[in-house]
Amino acid sequence: MSDYKTIAESKNFIVLDKYNKEWQVAESYQSEGDLEREFIQDLVNQGYESPLGLTTPDALLANVRVQLQALNNAQFSDGEWQRFVETWLDKPSDGIAEKTRKVHDDYVHDFVFDDGHIQNIYLLDKKNIARNKVQVIKQLEQKGSHANRYDVTILVNGLPLVQVELKKRGVAIREAFNQVHRYSKESFNSANSLFKYLQVFVISNGTDSRYFANTTQRNKNSFDFTMNWAKADNTLIKDLKDFTATFFQKDTLLKVLLRYSVFDTSNTLLVMRPYQIAATERILWKVNSAWQAKSWSTLEGGGFIWHTTGSGKTLTSFKAARLATELDFIDKVFFVVDRKDLDYQTMKEYQRFSPDSVNGSDSTAGLKRNLDKDDNKIIVTTIQKLNNLMKSEPDLPIYGKQVVFIFDECHRSQFGEAQKNLKKRFKRFYQFGFTGTPIFPDNALGAETTASVFGRELHSYVITDAIRDEKVLKFKVDYNDVRPQFKAIETELDEKKLSAAENKQALLHPDRIREITQY
């Protein structure tokens, strides 16, 4: 048997800082079948199991039984299994939304066995992600309005959570995207279909590989919402070989599916982009490492995230805050905004992501009441309310507890009195800022910069990255001519002539100002 050496590994991050390509470009022609076989072999080399004979829905369901029995250390009789499938796993009334909700929120079912004992049956182990069994199958055939045969399916505990559609190199990747759409209409969502559990689609033509969420929302269901995987410096990972070695690492894929995705209250599945995951991971890593080193309440125990406007900072900050609340040693997580309207807006957005995960307040007294609650909810507040609380309440129990602060738009409004009070009152805090416009020494009006207040930059995704990824609109620049008689003076090189003439004759001439203002 061949020896395979690790080519991508990180104990902290799934979005890698470094990745070394260790394969040669094939000299010969590669058919779609060759591409598929090579892809599956690469997955097997990475620890995926490749069971034979799983080519029908009945075989798929039988495999789910084997995997769930192993995961839960339980044995179903044939009658019990039939009842479990019909009443919960694959209820006839379940649609794609109900199945997805089971993956995200309702993944534990209290099942009553025939002898009367009750056991929690887990679909997925979210605490110990490595316990989930990952398998790869190919060419499964399923009938709906038409019979379809799917290229490659990734099973987690037997459930089809990822569907991969491949086209040979040179074929437009949109063809794979269109094929996935056709399957969604024709057979994925047919009655009694475990494919309603699908979370993520991956499409590739060998040279370009992308992933996207399985959603029925029409406004989220276009090619524009497909994403490349990337390294931490936002270098795109496109080739299927590289994509397989990074995105399809078992730990990475399971974390994307089970940790870095959100099924919101409007039944829209959001799968995070690489830069959002990278930022979230680095915040959590910083909190952990600062706690272990006891370097809380210092610049070393914090940092800032430079993500451009429109890149989805709200989802990133929510995930960072939500996962921080799950750390055993963290008592409270604050999300701090600088305007009252943003306070309400963020509350609504966070409640959309997860209805029971957040506490808001409409006053300083309300904020104090929320601090007294013994729950792990995120507290959303304005900097003004937080500052008023710190000024009016010099001695609160929260001041001595382990607290994470995440500041939205960490610009100059957070550099003043509130920062001083925070550092004076809170004894064990970790603070992080999100910004689209960081303040550096060369554009600082005062002594403070973003780094001097929050700590070093932990991750960046700037406007040029977003334009390249087509996640924000390009700049539109118009060069407009004003009246020609005023143009000559603007190119005058003689400073004496220019200073004498510019005000009266050209730049402040009423006709010129009128031309510009009326444009």
Stretches found by the model and what they are:
Residues 183-185, 413-430:
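Short, conserved "post-DEAD/DEAH" coupling segment immediately C-terminal to helicase motif II
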